[in-house]
Structures are given as C-alpha cells and as structure tokens.
Amino acid sequence: MAQAEGVSRALLSRRFQVFLQNPPHPLMVWKANPPTITSVPRRLWTYGFDGKWLGRGCVVLIHRDVTHKETLWWSDSMSESIDAYTKDITPIKHLTKDNHPVGTISDWKPGIVRIMGETWEGVYQQRCLVHVERDLKRLLPLHSPIPATQYLREIAMRICSLKTRADRNHFFFSLLLWHNEYESLLKERTIPVFGTTKKRWWYTHSNLRRAWRILTHDTDSLFEYLDVPIIPSTNNSLEGINSHLARRRGLPKEYQVAMMYWQLALSRCKTPSLRKQLWGIWKQVAAASQTTQIVT
C-alpha cells in the first residue's frame, strides 16, 4: 500500500495510527445501524458465540445474530473466561430488550453455556458440530492401529452430514452396534509396575473414552437443529474473518485487535450512507479521547 501511495511505510503507519489507537466500539455500530432484531419487533433469531485467538493470551470474543448474519458485539480478552463473557452478554441482553433468541450455538465451554442458559431461560442450546468434529478427529486418529478407533471414527465423521431425524436415528444405531462390539475397551485398565508411578491404574484407551462421551453424553445439544430449524448445526460467527488474518501478520497484538474491530464494524455498515454515519460517530469519540489524553 505504501508503494502504491508513493509514501514511506513509516508515514503510512503514522497516518493509520489514529485508527488503530481508537478502534470502533460496538455501541457506535448499534447507533449507526441498529441490528435487525431490534428494528423488527419479535423477530426470531439465533445467538452465536465464538472466539478468535490472535496468538497466546489474546482472543477476540464475537457475538452474532447468526440468523441474520449480523455481528452484535465484540471485545478482546486474555482468555474466553466467564468474567469476560458476562461483561459482554450483559449489554447485549439489555440492548435486545425482550427479544430473546430462540436458540444459541457455541463451542460448548461449560461455564459459558451455563451463563447463556441463565441469561435466556428456556432457550435451546446447540453445540457447534464443526467443533465437535474437530475434537473427534483429534481423539480418533485416522491411522490408528486399533480397529475400534477406526470404526468409531468412521461413524463419528458423519455427524456434520445428518439432515433428518431418520439420519440421527441411524447414527445412534451405528453407535449402539459399535458399543455392543467394543464396550470392553472402554472399561479396559492399565495397571503399572509397582513403584513406577503414584497412580494405581488408569483407563487404557482414554481418548476412545473421551470420544465416546462426546458422542453419547447430552445428545440433545448435538441435534437441536433437527427439531428447531432456525438453529444452525454449525457456528459461522467467524465466517470471512480468517481470510484477512494474513494482512495482520507482523503487527503488534493491539493493532491486530484494532484491525479486527474495524473489520467487524464495517461488516455491519456496508453502504456509503451507513459508513458515513459510523464515520461521524467515530470522529466525535476519537476527538474526545484525544482531548482527554492531552488534558491528562
């Protein structure tokens, strides 16, 4: 970009510094372009949450109306902690007023799932199947020498392609057949040589057990989308963001976060008129911020 503009990289960096030091807050976007769920009374929608990690110790938390493909809120934190999540969800609940979502979808971190249920009592909660599939691939290696692992992986990899209740029932039947044949492996224990470890025993196939638990524990959360069509099976809250990551490589973390904030804000204000409104709001806030810095 510096070459195209005929200026040095240092000068270009200085020109952009004010934008990187004053990234747009979600409330600016709410003011410039209120989301669909607030402009149309009782509009049905599904809430989605995910985090985009920018290396160790920095994650951007993204909250979406996945039904209308609109980002509602964002923030950054050192981790996807309950405190950080609660700090975001409180203003979202206030701003959406009584228009609660029909369902939620997330990567199923226990504490965050609990807060969702407490925030919107009685809401359907769907576990993102892409995250489930990713965990299962890790626990059930493709080239495992254990036939039971290979067989369970073959069954598990169907999870993202189930479209009907009949598909779900066939999926459960396949799991039942697997269990009838390999149940003993789930209970198999390893007893170490005396004195080599403090542990008396452990499960021999711990990853196999974890994968089995994912597939059979709280199965309603895996398939809410089959009974409530407005809820998706996967969380696309970060759709379109990954393609921009390469442009931020080499920047300090705080600038990477700022660029992501701008990207999220501009994804909500796509027309020239909306961006003009956002620009006016941002200038007022940025000017006030600079004045405060000078005074202090």
Kindly label every feature range from the protein language model.
Residues 1:
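Hydrophobic positions on the alpha-helical face of helix-turn-helix-like DNA-binding modules
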Residues 4-106, 110, 114-118, 122, ...:
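RNase H-like nuclease fold core
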Residues 20, 24, 97, 117-121, ...:
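Hydrophobic/aromatic-lined pockets within catalytic cores
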Residues 53-54, 110-111, 135, 250, ...:
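Short, solvent-exposed loop/turn segments at secondary-structure junctions
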Residues 102, 120, 153-296:
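Acidic/histidine-rich catalytic cores and adjacent linkers
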Residues 103-110, 115-157:
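Conserved beta-strand -> loop -> alpha-helix junction used to position metal-binding or nucleic-acid-contacting
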